[in-house]
Amino acid sequence: MINIKVTLPGFNENLTISQFTGNEESVLDDCKFWINKKIENPDIWFVFENITSEKEACAIDPKKVVFLSAETSYPDNHFLKDPRKNFLKQFGYIYTTYETINKSIKDMPFLPWMINSNHGDSIYSPSPRDVNYFLELKDLKKTKTLSIICSDKDFTEGHKKRLDFAYGLKEHFGDLIDWFGNGINPLDQKWDGISNYKYHISIENKNKDYLISEKLMDSFLGLSFPFYYGAQNTSDFFPKKSYFRLKRAQKNFRRKIYL
């Protein structure tokens, strides 16, 4: 068994990843995940963004300590600033969407799906819709046409543009589109705003290579065809015909939905 230490800030050690492993033992294949728990001699250590306390340590080869970036709304120079550059020096591998001075590997943000939740602790809570459920899911009855999930968050330029776009879509489509989101029309779980809909609009914080978040994955999991605004290289990860790429609000958008 490979023992993997995982540091996940913002959550306690009692969280469960059963949605993603399909069991309560935090085991996937031959890997055991120790989430925010003390383990003295792990085989590998994944750190999501930061550590959970002022100091955190274990006995491990430094080359096996891996940094994983998850945030999608950082400024482009976030990891070029001195405090972050120094922080990244201690990792054997760095996976991030953003530019770094340190040697790094470009990849998508390391985010869980959120279709069974609405952020916070509910992300890592048990659900009957776990990985095994989604692996077997082939069809869902669609009773509605179009939805979007976009909160009223507006503290970055990307948030403001996304919110403006959502207002424009609602003005254009009217009752054809259902708009959900914290501060707008909250949902306990995103499943309720995706699974009943034939189409779903997914808008990222930025139009940046590799910046592909749960916003697209949740649409796939709910079997709702995504109209997607996000990474230019999305087709490096998903078939081109599995989504429609938006270039902001398009004049022929309504016609394309009925194709």
Spans of model-derived segments:
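Short, intrinsically disordered, charge-balanced linker/junction segments flanking boundaries
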Residues: F253-L259
